[in-house]
């Protein structure tokens, strides 16, 4: 990654002898890479997010992927404020969009709290971005 290579992460197996703990979730793959690779810097964590999103499409030579005008509009909206939170929290997928059409939705995850003098709920998501 530091050398400028287009690195991609993925997994081919789900709940089989090769990967009995694999879920098929690329955010789990990125989460494992952060831990196993000791990639704990903010830029390194962002690079792990790219390694499960943009980079695989680039490595496969797929066109029409990304957030540019004219792309396929295939995306997942996460309950996270940034890529670092997406990997840290492995959040709810609020919307799955394919070719511009919502094909799956989930309600936001909220934890209810019963603590006197404190908020009644939390999403464990930052409301503001930390300084760089």
PLM segments and residue spans:
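His/Asp/Glu-enriched, well-ordered alpha-helical/loop segment
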Residues: 1-78
């Amino acid at each position: 990654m530091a050398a400028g290579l287009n690195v991609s992460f993925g997994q081919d197996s789900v709940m089989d002898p090769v990967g009995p703990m694999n879920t098929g979730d690329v955010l789990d793959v990125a989460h494992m890479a952060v831990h196993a690779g000791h990639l704990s810097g903010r830029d390194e964590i962002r690079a792990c997010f790219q390694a499960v999103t943009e980079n695989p499409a680039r490595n496969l030579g797929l066109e029409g992927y990304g957030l540019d005008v004219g792309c396929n509009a295939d995306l997942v909206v996460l309950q996270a404020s940034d890529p670092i939170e997406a990997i840290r929290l492995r959040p709810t997928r609020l919307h799955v969009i394919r070719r511009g059409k919502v094909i799956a939705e989930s309600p936001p995850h909220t934890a209810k709290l019963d603590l006197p003098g404190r908020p009644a709920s939390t999403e464990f998501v930052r409301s503001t971005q930390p300084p760089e």
